[in-house]
Amino acid sequence: MAEATRALGYEDNHPIILFAKQEYANAEIQLQYYQTRLEEYDLFWKKRYEEYPVATEIWLFIKDQDWNDYVCAGILGNIMSEVGGGTLNIQYWLYGSSYYGICQWSKGYKNQVWGTDLETQCQFLVDTIEYELDTFGYAYKKGFDFEDFLELEDEEEVAKAFAVAYERCSRLGIPKRQSNATKAYDYFVS
């Protein structure tokens, strides 16, 4: 803008040129701020990928669904109990005599998830969660459904709701799933 006003014959001390210079300086400051933030963001996620690549991949996959951090942490807290040994070291390929994968799906889902990669399992989770919560949400709370689940704002409550309505596991393990959810929340959000 300053160059254009000079071309029109304005002096360097004209208000339009001074304004353009100030706007350019402000833009430089903002650019530097956002470049620094981007570098910090990249470093944050690089560190997480290096330390816990599978947990990070799951977190980002479910975050891409526009689910809040509490929902993501609650789901991941359950996965940590299923195939992480209570840690973020998720081993998605684990199976038992009757169960497989990040949610230890039963043989009834063999054709959909058994022997599949992480992305396929994450997509299966996303594809089935609404039906499961709409169908079995009552086990958590009367009238509870998928939309209610997405509105929860406490990772421990999300972990409990997911455990009883999606995983349908023993209630004895719920406190561990809840503490895992808090670990996941603290790791990925804090």
Q: Which residues does each predicted region cover?
A:
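Short, functionally critical alpha-helical segments immediately adjacent to catalytic or ligand/cofactor-binding
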Residues: 69-86, 160-163
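Solvent-exposed, polar/charged alpha-helical surfaces in well-ordered, non-transmembrane soluble domains
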Residues: 56, 60, 76, 123, ...
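Intrinsically disordered, low-complexity
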Residues: 4-70, 174-190
